[in-house]
Amino acid sequence: MLKNKVAVIYGAGGAVGSAVARAFAREGAKLFLTGRHRAPVETVAKEIDSASGRAETAEVDALDEQSVDRHLQSVIDKAGRIDISFNAVGIANTRLQGVPLVELKVEQFSLPIATYTRSYFLTARLAARRMVEKRSGVIMTVTSIPSRTGIPLMGGVAPAMSAVEALTRDLSAELAPQGIRVVGLRPQGMPDSGTIKEVFGLHAKAYGISWEQFQEMIASRTHGRRLTTLAEMANMAVFMASDGASAMTGTIVNLSLGSLDD
């Protein structure tokens, strides 16, 4: 589905980024994997290379405009174009969630909002400037269920996710006439992601239960009585990035297994 597509992935060393990288590689994409720390990204690239995929790595701070810009230009110099930009950056949730808003410091509240909106804006804007020349490309974002429904103890993460979804729609409104699609994924918490386990642990502690019990509680609210997996999210990302989804733009795909009505 993605044969010879050139894809840049931010946060490629994390659970979401690495899952998407493997899925893109399986479908024939040429990958340029990035992260703030090179070691975990190199691990993913080696795994892809060993499976006959194609992946190059770079240390890129997705909050640094010059760092992102230099890297994208290097991709253009090597591959000639950018077909897909997938941002999977994340920040540690310790002290950012699991605390009531009335007790949360303003710095803790503001951090995820500033971090996610800056990163998604920078990576999208700089990729779009290259994509416009070819009048084609796909920019992809990742959010979460709290962007659409009130959930206690989320701190500034929920407002950050809502902002990213608004940015996704606005980017699409401006870029679609120039051949660029902008789409987002909104998965339910994925228990095979280390980040989600950390988040579940923070919320479980506040409820006075184990993270396993908290996970069961969240899963019980879905139609399938289970949670989304990384593989399911990555498979959907493949379709959304492919030419088969050419009519899809300005939308956030709901991967909540029915726990959130559209």
What are these regions (language model features)?
Residues 176, 181, 248-250:
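Short, small/polar-rich loop/turn modules that mediate ligand/substrate recognition or access, typified
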Residues 129, 173-174, 246:
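Alpha-helical segment proximal to the catalytic Tyr-Lys
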Residues 6, 13-14, 37:
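Conserved glycine-rich cofactor-binding loop
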Residues 90-110, 133, 153-156:
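Conserved mid-core segment of classical short-chain dehydrogenase/reductases
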Residues 226, 237-238, 249-262:
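Short C-terminal tail/terminal secondary-structure segment
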